[in-house]
């Protein structure tokens, strides 16, 4: 079954490239806006793709929507722009790199936390010094004392694997596994999901792959796949979910392009009777 899905994805990818969809003016910019909108929406932002476009291009805020939702989107945009630049130089994934990315996306919404383990600033990408759980009665993440060593280990694994991943599927699945493992370690008090999705896309940028979007309407399935992996200590549910998201992303982009090409232009003039 998995092999069949990846064959479909490769065919869609070839079609996407053949149609020259990403060559359209500002395509990358607006697709990035969509990535950002869906990533923050998974964390509770109420901004739509149109809201985000107006915010980024015109500086216009969405009436009646919380300021923090605008700040989340602005900060994540800066983090993605940094990731795009760093991917051009294939900057290695290190703990310092991950802290920089988290600091960028938590720049205006993070704060200083004083806990039993000490004080840390979540706006500067500092690792948590306290325990965290996934909501009331939810999954408890690893002890904060173990976080630095586990992040070091993850970065070493990713650096080594990036040199060896040769096939289309291997490259994508490396990015998906990076996402899963970082969010499972949960190094920060906030912004773990956004940073994990950014890391996934960063690896895809490094390989010049189409960046995978996780759709806000699939949030529940996304969270369930992560929990299943964490409970059963297997990556398969998440890899299957992400393959589905990639297929969905490519299919929608191709369909939108085809619809736009079929539209017939008609002159529009006001008729005065």
Q: Where do the model's predicted regions map?
A:
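FIC/Doc superfamily catalytic core
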Residues: 1-190, 194-273
